[in-house]
UniProtKB/Swiss-Prot annotation:
EC number: 5.4.2.10
Highest taxon of the lineage: Bacteria
Cofactor(s) this protein cannot do without: Mg(2+)
CDD domains xref list: GlmM (cd05802)
Annotated protein name in UniProt: Phosphoglucosamine mutase
BP-aspect Gene Ontology terms: carbohydrate metabolic process; peptidoglycan biosynthetic process; UDP-N-acetylglucosamine biosynthetic process
Active-site residues from the entry: 102 (phosphoserine intermediate)
Post-translational modification: Activated by phosphorylation.
Length: 451
């Protein structure tokens, strides 16, 4: 049995259209609530969200579903995804819910679920919940005297702020550092600038005025132009860009040059190795990470384990094999000594600690290896047609041709997005011209096949 609703990062879609409707959210609340009402204690679910307008559609629907099966609901308001995971654990909740579509535009929304341990649910849990949504929900409603209750946690943001500061080494401060932080008009718009300011930095906030529509719009980790411009204009030491739910981060140095997740994993992995903190003898990355990262770590006697794309798969390998550093090139950085999921702010704080301790500028500290030329392009196709397009004879022929040209000189990766109707085409190799030509040829063929 395969999941139909749940993708690689929960349920996602265009808000107020199937499946991302209030009706679905209420059914999800009932089914997930029933699945996690084990034991005879009072059952609790915490719900956080980002700043999308449609959060007001989904939050009350989920709340109604949970209350109807006897679960108490604690509403956290706008908070980063890792904060929801943290509070699920610290409040001894049975379940955590984050309403967010991460880096997607405001029209989309999504729902991620966390178990009582703060980790994302297993495939098996998601399958069980999905099956329950299709049948048998009437029987799980409780009587009116056993309905759950809802309350808002007023100090939720403050709890996460204290936790984030706790991950920064004691005795260090950010005095004298000027930092631009782009919060994507998203979930971290209050907490990220506050954490940096409380640690002593001069903070230049960008995209901290959410209006329900501007999340990720020309800002955040996918649109870094403003952050880079502000870093150069203000003479800042570092730029930090988060995405809409702040579970991913990218940086730029004082010159405005970008630092992606691969460079961050190289830095943290190397530093933690030298300090004896690194576990597993290396890091866990995905198939999208640059070969330059692997070569850099190999030179230091460290291994690189690769997984399918998606932070859930990275985390699965980390937990199974005992690693404590992992992530994605896109900026999902998982530091399991601190978090149960990707945490952009906490990852950024580890980099800032390294900068303070070294006394070097970011341009010297954060570019540890030269990446091989890599080109990634996305092709949007009609929903539900990805497999059909990839199976088209012309597309298969274009892929075979590119593979033949890159043989021995690079690699090619074609995959469908787990969260959007996109086909991602990536090539990497020593010859930049060949890499770009290979990707362009496949992208053009996919576009023709998609009509």
């Amino acid at each position: 049995m395969t999941r139909k609703l749940f993708g690689t990062d929960g349920i996602r879609g265009t808000a107020n259209t199937d499946p991302m409707t209030a009706e679905m959210a209420m059914k999800l609340g009932m089914a997930a609530g029933r699945h996690f009402t084990r034991g005879d204690h009072r059952h609790v679910v915490v719900i956080g969200k980002d700043t999308r307008l449609s959060g007001y559609l989904l939050e009350p629907a989920l709340t109604a579903g949970f209350i109807s099966v006897g679960m108490d609901v604690v509403l956290l308001g706008p908070l980063p995804t890792p904060a929801v995971a943290l509070l699920t654990r610290s409040m001894r909740a049975d379940l955590g819910v984050m309403i967010s579509a991460s880096h997607n535009p405001y029209e989309d929304n999504g729902i991620k679920l966390f178990g009582p341990d703060g980790f994302k649910l297993s495939d098996e849990d998601e399958l069980t919940i999905e099956a329950s949504m299709s049948n048998g929900l009437e029987s799980c409603r409780v009587g009116s005297d056993h309905l759950g209750r809802a309350k808002r946690l007023d100090d939720a943001a403050g709890r996460y702020i204290e936790y984030a500061k706790y991950t920064f080494p004691r005795g260090l401060r950010l005095d004298g550092l000027k930092i631009v932080v782009d919060c994507a008009n998203g979930a971290a718009y209050k907490v990220a600038p506050t954490v940096l300011w409380e640690l002593g930095a001069e903070v230049i906030p960008v995209a901290v005025n959410p209006d329900g529509f501007n999340i990720n719009k020309n800002c955040g980790s996918l649109h870094t132009e403003t952050m880079r411009e502000q870093v150069v204009a203000h003479g800042a030491h570092l730029g930090i860009a988060l995405d809409g739910d702040a579970d991913r981060v990218v940086l730029c140095d004082e010159l405005g040059h970008m630092i992606d997740g691969d460079q961050l994993m190289a830095l943290i992995g190397d530093l933690w190795h030298r300090s004896g903190q690194l576990k597993g003898g290396g890091i866990v990355a995905t198939v999208m990470s640059n070969l330059g990262l692997e070569r850099f770590l190999d030179q230091r006697g460290l291994k690189t384990i690769r997984t399918a794309v998606g932070d859930r798969y990275v985390l699965e390998h980390m937990r199974r094999d005992g690693f404590n550093v992992g992530g994605e090139q896109s900026g999902h950085i998982i530091l399991s000594d601190h978090s149960t999921t990707g945490d952009g702010l906490v990852a950024g704080l580890q980099v800032l600690a390294a900068l303070v301790q070294s006394g070097k500028p970011a341009s010297e500290m954060l570019r540890l290896f030269t990446p091989l030329p890599q080109v990634l392009k996305n092709v949007r196709v009609a929903k539900g047609s990805v497999a059909e397009v990839l199976a088209a004879p012309a597309v298969e022929a274009a892929i075979r041709d590119a593979e033949a040209k890159l043989a021995g000189q690079g690699r090619l990766l074609i995959r469908k997005s787990g969260t959007e109707p996109l086909i991602r085409v990536m090539a990497e190799g020593e010859d930049e011209g060949l890499v770009e030509a290979s990707v362009d040829a496949i992208v053009e063929t996919i576009r023709r096949a998609a009509g």
